Regions:
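Glycine-aromatic micro-motifs
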Residues: 1-151
Length: 151
C-alpha cells in the first residue's frame, strides 16, 4: 500500500512536493467516522496545538491522497515526527468518488486538547483550499478558536 491520506498542512500539494517530489497527489476523499482536532499544546515546542484526528462516529475529515513513492517515505516520516514518536502511523479506509481506498495517516501519539495558533490554523485552511476541499469545510476550519500567541 502506497497511499498516504493527508488531512493537515500536507493537504497542500506544493508543500508535499517539497518533501516528497516523487509522490503525486492522486485524488481526494473523506475519512468517515473521524474528526479533525488539535493536540499536544506545549508538548512539541510549538506555540499552540497541532492537528490530529480521532475516531468520532458521524463525523468526517477531508483528505488528499498521495501515491507515496518509497524514496519519499522515510523523509515524510521524519518530517511528520513518526521517527521521534510524536505521531504514529495508522491504516484507514478513505471514501472517494471511485470507491474506498486503503491508506495510512499519521495521528498524534499524545492526548487530545489545546488550541492552534491563528497562523497554523490559517495554514491548514489554505492547504485544504488548495487541495479542493468544499468551501464549508474550509470555512469551518477558519472559524475554529485559536490560541493567543505569547509575547
Amino acid at each position: 500500500m502506497r497511499h498516504y491520506a493527508a488531512y493537515g498542512s500536507n493537504l497542500d500539494p506544493d508543500r508535499m512536493r517539497a518533501y516528497c517530489p516523487h509522490s503525486p497527489m492522486v485524488g481526494t476523499g473523506w475519512l468517515e467516522g473521524w474528526r479533525l482536532t488539535f493536540a499536544g499544546e506545549d508538548v512539541i515546542g510549538w506555540e499552540g496545538a497541532v492537528c490530529t484526528i480521532v475516531e468520532s462516529p458521524g463525523d468526517r475529515v477531508f483528505v488528499a491522497l498521495y501515491d507515496l513513492h518509497p524514496w519519499d517515505a522515510a523523509e515524510l516520516e521524519r518530517v511528520e515526527g513518526v521517527t521521534a514518536g510524536t505521531y504514529r502511523k495508522l491504516h484507514v479506509r478513505v471514501a472517494t468518488l471511485d470507491g474506498e481506498v486503503t491508506a495510512w495517516v499519521y495521528v498524534f501519539a499524545g492526548y487530545e486538547g489545546g488550541l492552534p495558533t491563528a497562523w497554523y490554523l490559517s495554514e491548514l485552511a489554505n492547504a485544504a483550499q488548495k487541495a479542493g476541499a468544499p468551501d464549508d469545510y474550509v470555512a469551518q476550519l477558519r472559524s475554529h478558536p485559536t490560541r493567543t500567541a505569547s509575547a
